[in-house]
Amino acid sequence: MSAMLSVKDLAVSFQTRRGEVGAVKGISFEVSKGEILGIVGESGSGKSVTSYALMRILDAGGVIKAGDATYSGIDLRRSSERDMRDIRGREISMIFQNPRAALNPIRKVGHQIEDVLRHHSRATRYDAKAKAIAALEAVKINDAEARYNAYPFELSGGMCQRIVCAIALACDPRLLIADEPTTGLDITTQKAVMDLVRDLIRERSMSSILITHDLGLAAQYCDRILVMKDGVIVEQGDPVQIFSNPQHSYSRKLVDATPRVGTDVRSLLPPEDRGDELVPVVSDRPLLEVRDLNKIYAGKSGPVHAVKGISFTINQGQCVGLVGESGCGKSTTSEILVRLMDATSGEIIFDGDDIAQVPANGFAKDGRRADIQMVFQDATDSLNPRHTSRQTIAEPLRRLGKMRGVKLTARIEELAALVGLPLSLLDRFPHQLSGGQKARVGIARAVALEPKFLILDEPTAALDVSIQAVVLNLLVDLRAKLGLSYLFVSHDLHVVRLLCDHVIVMKDGEIVEQGPSQEIMSNPQSDYTKTLLAAAPKPPARRQAN
């Protein structure tokens, strides 16, 4: 196969207040015609910077220091900016990580597709509209003419990602760069988007670079994989070979940290970090009983029944998984249980009392507030950027625990030790912490008041696999040490399989199936559960050393 893209000795640096920082350090690779190349690695590995360098859209301070990048005979590094404007979109196009950030919120999506068409093909307004609608149909958007006039905020995350795909593919580029195209999407939407991208690439005889931290996704959709660490390619090869028999220690670490069938939560960690396994004690005594819970919102076209008469029980010490696609009602259920909003009807029996009788806006002053806490999906968004880790952990202790002085300081340091946060990080702000460190701060804040029940809302969704492994093991240990009960909200069925004793599957506001985790995962009864399991990426098995 002839190379469509050839990269040789590419080096990229950023100028910072502390001096020059090398982000990409002399990497070389090729992309053949018709090939899907995966670039995998954790945050800071240089994979996204590589793609931005190829497109010549580096952030301020970024400079290509050395190397060459040649696309179909065109020198991308030395082409003029005017030439690059023609190349972007028409020859090389990009799907960005956050679809909502990539779309203009105050312009109709159809007009945003037209912009690309009119710039690159000089189409008339009439022709551009027809081609924009055709682009929407190509990415399998139903009722494309109506969606043409929609604004991004009127569409789901999966729909917005399809719009971004339509924009990227509108001018029939020959090379598509997809930068974390499924981050934040539920599992069936992720599969639909990736199947769509793969099929369009095959139909149009394109090439593609898939940038991701999800090795399972790369293994399923890529012809070849590069593994990057600290700006360097440490290994490359066939996905099955890399997954089954990784040669580099970093590749082995990533592969072992990827949840899949046949693994347990301790095996995600390197052997030297596993320690003694702590086994949670699950009681037969119910801690939380939800009975016939309903939530109805007032919508423009009539009432919206978000939660429809659901019932379930969580025992003391038990971890229950709540899974389903976006819009199934799991987040609404979580917010009702943590008393951020009121139910329309139903009972929430917590430790013998019906807390649904206490209005949500008054629950902060209720004595049971400390017993129910939440760990949020995005640790960055859930932390006050102006508060240090110490101040964040101290807040519930001051407000609800009435702690002050030496006692407060001692408790903060005790909590930091409990979640594995070095004391040296207590006086740092969120922007000075890694994703895993921010997750530890959020967990420390949640357990500060010794709650009985934690709601975990996608707590590892935005984390790299090795950091996810550490956080999952921390949650298992805390559950055993503190006797906590969890409601674990997630769309990652591999993680739910590892962590949860019991699973609840929701669809359209209803529970379609629930039962013991292993039973649900190995022998699902509902067609919907079967669909969710079929959509989950299936990484190749790891070959065990003799």
Q: What do these predicted regions represent?
A:
Residues 40-41, 323-325:
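The feature captures the beta-strand-to-loop junction immediately N-terminal to the Walker
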Residues 3, 142-148, 239-289, 300-303, ...:
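Short catalytic/signature loops enriched in Gly
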Residues 150-155, 159, 429-433, 437:
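Conserved ABC ATPase signature
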Residues 75, 127-146, 354, 407-424, ...:
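Conserved ABC ATPase "signature" region
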Residues 89, 153, 171, 449:
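Conserved signature/switch motifs of ABC ATPase nucleotide-binding domains
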Residues 64-75, 346-357:
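Conserved ABC transporter NBD signature motif
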